């Protein structure tokens, strides 16, 4: 997914945040695929975060909601604040939809301005039907996660939220 023009832009931006001049490092590589593979090998953390951010930018615009008039201040991204946010998201989905019993929240700062929060609450339980490594048929209960993305811009005071579902 990063072997594209937007993907390489995400890599270069993330590298700059970490004090790396990846534009210069990647300049002589002949293809997007070569550039992405080079970063995956030499700067795996940059590659991982750039992939996450690039993924957010490729999500369907249909499910994004925009809100202005947010307080123009830096959010609290401490572990305690992220834990409280995680618990609030989990509680919301448990109470309103009967899912979200567990949740993980990852936070990323992008180009020293944009705060991304990726929440992964549990979806409804299901059973995996398939074969294990020994070829034996198995039924395994599982709770896959679904994704909710929050993008906060403290300078403009805007919040964009991505949640796949019906129109609100």
List each model region and its residues:
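Intrinsically disordered, low-complexity polar/charged tails and linkers
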Residues: 1-142
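C-terminal structured domains
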Residues: 128-150, 155-156, 163-168
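Broad gene-expression machinery/nucleic-acid interaction feature
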Residues: 114-116, 147, 158
């Amino acid at each position: 997914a990063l072997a594209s023009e937007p993907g390489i832009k995400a890599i270069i931006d993330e590298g700059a945040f970490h004090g790396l001049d990846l534009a210069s490092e990647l300049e002589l590589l002949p293809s997007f695929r070569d550039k992405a593979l080079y970063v995956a090998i030499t700067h795996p953390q940059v590659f991982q975060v750039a992939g996450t951010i690039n993924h957010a930018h490729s999500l369907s615009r249909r499910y994004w909601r925009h809100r202005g008039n947010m307080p123009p201040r830096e959010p609290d991204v401490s572990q305690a604040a992220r834990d409280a946010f995680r618990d609030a998201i989990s509680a919301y989905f448990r109470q309103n939809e009967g899912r979200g019993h567990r949740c993980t929240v990852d936070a990323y700062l992008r180009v020293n301005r944009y705060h991304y929060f990726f929440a992964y609450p549990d979806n409804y339980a299901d059973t995996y039907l398939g074969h294990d490594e020994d070829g034996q048929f198995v039924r395994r209960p599982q709770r896959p996660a679904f994704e909710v993305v929050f993008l906060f811009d403290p300078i403009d005071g805007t919040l964009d939220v991505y949640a796949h579902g019906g129109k609100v």
